[in-house]
């Protein structure tokens, strides 16, 4: 079961098989309504940030997050959970004398949504094969990797180049999703990076946020170049609770 424990390091793929599918299972083990953080939940937070700050550059508006460490090349260097608990549902960096860039950050109660450690982003599959076609989960379908079954193709493709997000696609059924279709060398548009591997001959999945050495590329950094079976010492997960409302 995936849990958030104050004073403990986030789980990583260093010692555990934290693939996207396994993170999904660990979240579901918490009970009804619990699932892995998804592209749809991310979009809600992005829009809230944009409305509140008139910007998508979370690092400049809220705090850099844990992104300026020097990597040791061998361990999970993520900082422990809970440093921003004193902020409640507020926003900002660690109130206990933290150094911006080397301490936890929180936006509306979501701690280290960017920086610290990559987290898997669920309910989005990317069919690379020279196209980077984006598929998102349809309500009621089974959530799975490496498939289009139960997923809807959006009317645009994930960016074919790495860089700072400079344009987003619009799908009439999912206008809320801010998935980058273009990238540039300038961070003035959103301040958020995008990574891709569109020549890969198969399906790819997404990660969010960046890690402890990500620097200014962190934020709502979308990495769309991982295979579903990937695990690493800087990959983790984030759980999400979706209220179970019955419709009469």
Label every model-predicted segment.
Residues 1-113:
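Short aromatic-cysteine micro-motif
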Residues 1-34, 121, 127-160, 164-165, ...:
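Extracellular adhesion/carbohydrate-recognition regions
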Residues 50-52, 59-60, 132-136, 222:
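Surface-exposed beta-strand edges and their flanking turn/coil or helix-capping segments
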Residues 54-56, 139, 226:
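Short, low-complexity, polar/charged sequence segments that are solvent-exposed and flexible
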């Amino acid at each position: 079961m995936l849990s958030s424990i104050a004073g403990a390091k986030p789980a990583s793929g260093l010692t555990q098989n934290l693939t996207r599918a396994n993170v999904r299972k660990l979240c579901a083990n918490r009970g009804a309504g619990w699932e892995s953080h998804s592209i749809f939940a991310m979009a809600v937070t992005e829009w809230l940030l944009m409305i509140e700050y008139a910007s998508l550059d979370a690092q400049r508006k809220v705090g850099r997050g844990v992104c300026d460490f020097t990597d040791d090349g061998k361990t999970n260097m993520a900082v422990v959970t809970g440093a921003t608990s004193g902020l409640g549902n507020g926003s900002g960096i660690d109130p206990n004398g933290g150094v911006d860039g080397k301490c936890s950050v929180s936006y509306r109660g979501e701690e280290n949504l960017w920086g610290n450690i990559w987290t898997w982003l669920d309910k989005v599959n990317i069919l690379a094969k020279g196209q980077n076609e984006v598929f998102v989960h349809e309500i009621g379908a089974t959530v799975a990797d490496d498939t289009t079954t139960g997923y809807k193709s959006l009317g645009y493709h994930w960016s074919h180049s790495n860089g700072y997000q400079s344009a987003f696609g619009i799908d009439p059924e999912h206008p809320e999703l801010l998935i980058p279709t273009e990238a540039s060398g300038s961070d003035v548009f959103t301040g958020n990076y995008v990574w891709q591997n569109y020549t890969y001959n198969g399906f790819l999945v997404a990660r969010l946020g960046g890690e402890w050495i990500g620097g200014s590329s962190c934020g709502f950094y979308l990495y769309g170049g991982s295979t579903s079976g990937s695990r690493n010492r800087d990959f983790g997960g984030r759980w999400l609770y979706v209220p179970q409302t019955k419709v009469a």
